[in-house]
Amino acid sequence: MSLKLDVFQQVYQLSLASNMAQACQASPLELQTMIAAALPETLTKYAGPGWEVAWGPAVWKHDGATDEMPPDNVWYVAKHPAIEFEDGSICPTYVVAIAASTGDDFKSYDWLYEGFGVGQVVNFLEWAEGGRIVAPPVSSLPTSNLAYTAKSTTDAAYTLAAFPPLGSQPLKEFLKALNPQPGSKLIFTGHSLGGILSPTLAVALTVAGFTRKFKGNTLVYPICGASPGNTHFGELFQDLFPPRGDISTYRRWNVNLVNELDPVPQLWCVDPMGKLNLNNIPHLYGELPQAARIYMNSIVRCLKARATASGMMYSPLRYSLIRGPEPSSPPKNAEEVIAEFTKQHSRAYNEVVLGSAPTPGSLRQRFTRVRRSRL
């Protein structure tokens, strides 16, 4: 890798590396084995020399999933002995990187449940507090002045904390057992679904005491995540992780990195007065033709119904706004709208954050070759 990346760009690349199992179909053991084999070279090539795998990767599939389904969650921990931060300090650094949705359609478990299952919520501090992380409680009607998150998000965060990779220990136990050098930093990051789960997991592990060895040195770098919970959860997140860095750039910690033209960070707030809310989605790219407008309005109605079924007002986390390249003209039909959504949700972030730097790809073709060779 010839380009020198700043710390934010390196963390961004580590996040992208967690997505290498995108649309890969195999058993969890096969997936874990092939990701583990590819990660070391990937980290060096794209994030830079010195990065290595400290834990994982972990691969999780829901009960009933087959080998012909992609993984539901992939996550790992990378470490570097000496990373230069934006303030000039040089610190040993651990990064928890969480994959985006790995299914290639909207029918996969991670899309349908973890991403869009927002109709039920749970009291966040009922499962993560006071030195313990337990299975999340059953959903309940939200109570004022308490932090609530989507049950689907909470269940996934619990999986990330408590599910062990084959042959290893759970992430929470790994962090508890670590003996980092003084001044070491711990960073949570992820894109899309990972952008929802990274702040949720960071809060859970922190309030439960599993990151105490990084007290004052834990950072979060979520990328284009939807809203995980209500205002009180957002306040809890901000209290634990105050924003720091340049406003309205990618160089800012503890805020959601948001492309103004990306629909995903507009989820799941329904308050039309908010900067980020579902009502914005049909208008992101100008005036649509009637058929496309009707189509998009119907989608937004369905999304609103999911959000309001929770009985709670979802509220975005603090964010840093960037702006992807605007389309030269409004999309002409629903297919073009979806294509623009896809571009603004992925490639636009790469261009703003990384410029011309290359990015990690999927192992899908490699998985296909290996599986064919075994037939």
List PLM regions with ranges:
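A conserved cap/lid and substrate-binding interface adjacent to the catalytic center
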Residues: 59-186, 209-213, 217, 243, ...
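Intrinsic structural disorder/low-complexity segments
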Residues: 16, 25, 144, 148-151, ...
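Gly/Ala-rich beta-loop-alpha elbow adjacent to hydrolase catalytic centers
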Residues: 190-194, 198
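Short, solvent-exposed loop/turn and secondary-structure capping segments
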Residues: 106-114, 200, 231-233, 267-268
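Active-site-proximal beta-strand/loop segments in catalytic clefts of secreted hydrolases
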Residues: 97-101, 192, 223-225, 259-260
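Serine hydrolase/lipase
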Residues: 1-12, 156-187, 203-375
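N-terminal low-complexity, Ser/Thr- and acidic-residue-enriched intrinsically disordered segments
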Residues: 1-102
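Short, glycine/acidic-rich beta->alpha junctions
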Residues: 69, 197, 229
